[in-house]
Amino acid sequence: MMKNLRLLLLILVVQPSCTQQDTNDGDWTDIPYSDAAPLRTNSVGISEDYLHTNRGIWQKPDVVVDLLGDLENKVVADIGAGTGFFTYKILPRAEKVIAIDIDPEFINYLDSLKAINLPESQYWRLETRLAEPEMPAPINYQEVDVILVVNTYIYLEDRIKYLESLRENLKPGGKLVIIDFKKKRTPVGPPQDIRMPLYVVEEELYQAGFEYVHTNDTYLDFQYILTAEKQLSVN
């Protein structure tokens, strides 16, 4: 009963100002998050509350989404979707977004936002999937065109195997974008001792079979960006 009441209150608090439409148009980028949004406690027991750190400024979401490329008629997987910070910024540009998270509270939260923001005829454009610990992401073979992994990579178990699974489930020519915190002192982010240097992530992408790995540690103040592609034809 209390869980249902909490969800009802959450829906009322996050009621957005945008109107529902039967097209891809509309202001999806200003979903008002609230104190009712659940917090992430990661695999090492650290609570991450980026919603209250001016994330809309330091994360530079428009820059990140632009890096995903032309998303028209594309399917995008948002791994570690959390409260949907990127999910709802990608949705206006893509045909479909698959929001993946390991925490059922976030899945319930995203489903409640979907019921508010999308007309029923458009529900299929946002699908939530619950990930299992120490298991590959729940994505089917060659199901997606783009995969985004933000503030999540350092917590993955058996990362090479995980990346190999992502590569397999990307369509030929697909793109993987990984963003995580630089291994240095920053005002926000996890402790430095659990952060991963950019060059380590780069090497692991190559080990997993990705081609054309590009790195950037200047676009974002606190984070680095890696972009990897799956070649069009695989022997």
Residue spans for each PLM region:
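A short acidic, Gly/Pro-enriched loop at the edge of an enzyme's catalytic core
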Residues: 137-147
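Class I SAM-dependent methyltransferase SAM/SAH-binding core
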Residues: 77, 81-136
